[in-house]
């Protein structure tokens, strides 16, 4: 490689004078915003298990995690579809193909709406599938399954606009939303638990995702 770069392909040898240091601030700034988003998301979602363990006990943590993994199948399936759209939105944004971006967003919204009956069906079949999966040792209330189905739908719609915003590099909105949610998460989850029980703890991250979807849509 050294011989090639010093000989025939010398014009392609990396050089410091080709580096545009003026772009550092923009690149580091965008990367920093993504870092804050990831840390805030990690804090909020891990805090759920801690709060449930503190206020409802270890058994409730088991119930939550089983139901969460069950409905996360829907979220993961949707994310597989969303992933290639990130780079596609970036390419379309650079080329100013706004009509394509709007049409793609509309199709993703339709897919999100189609996920609602799927989530309802998953709730209806949840007790049977839980028993088939883990046996009858852990009883998971249908209300908890319904709460996590709503959470899955909230993540789906939030993911639509996150994909669009990430593709265009406009992540400040979601950074502020997650920062705010990380600051109020603990008291909000405690209050939600005492008002609505275990299902109320899941209510807070669902509201965050729906809020993210609304802000992204606007």
Kindly label every feature range from the protein language model.
Residues 33, 48-49, 62-78, 110:
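Alpha-helical transmembrane segments of polytopic membrane transporters and translocases
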Residues 42, 69-72, 119, 152, ...:
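Residue-level recognition of pore/gate-forming positions within transmembrane alpha-helices
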Residues 15, 72-96, 164-167:
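Helix-loop junctions and terminal segments of transmembrane helices
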Residues 1-45, 88, 95-99, 218:
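Interhelical loop/hinge segments that connect adjacent transmembrane helices in multipass membrane
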Residues 1, 169-172, 182-214, 218:
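Membrane-interface helix-loop junctions in multi-pass transport and translocation proteins
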Residues 27-28, 97-113, 120-125, 142-145:
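Interfacial transmembrane-helix starts/ends
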Residues 58, 98-99, 123-153, 199:
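Interfacial segments at transmembrane-helix termini and the short loops linking adjacent helices
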Residues 150-180:
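Membrane-interface junctions at transmembrane-helix termini in multi-pass inner-membrane proteins
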């Amino acid at each position: 490689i050294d011989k090639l770069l010093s000989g025939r392909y010398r014009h392609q040898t990396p050089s410091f004078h080709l580096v545009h240091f003026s772009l550092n601030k923009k690149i580091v700034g965008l990367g920093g915003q993504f870092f804050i988003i990831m840390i805030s998301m990690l804090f909020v979602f891990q805090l759920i298990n801690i709060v449930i363990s503190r206020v409802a006990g270890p058994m409730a943590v088991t119930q939550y995690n089983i139901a969460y993994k069950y409905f996360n199948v829907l979220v993961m399936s949707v994310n597989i579809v969303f992933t290639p759209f990130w780079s596609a939105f970036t390419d379309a944004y650079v080329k100013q193909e706004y009509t394509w971006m709007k049409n793609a967003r509309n199709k993703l919204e339709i897919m999100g709406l189609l996920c609602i009956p799927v989530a309802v069906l998953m709730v209806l079949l949840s007790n049977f599938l839980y028993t088939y999966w883990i046996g009858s040792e852990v009883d998971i209330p249908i209300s908890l399954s319904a709460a996590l189905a709503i959470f899955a739908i909230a993540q789906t719609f939030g993911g639509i606009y996150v994909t669009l915003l990430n593709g265009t590099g406009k992540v400040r909105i979601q950074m502020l939303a997650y920062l705010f949610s990380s600051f109020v998460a603990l008291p909000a989850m405690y209050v939600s638990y005492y008002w609505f029980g275990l299902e109320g703890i899941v209510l807070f991250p669902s509201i965050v995702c729906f809020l993210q979807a609304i802000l992204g849509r606007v």
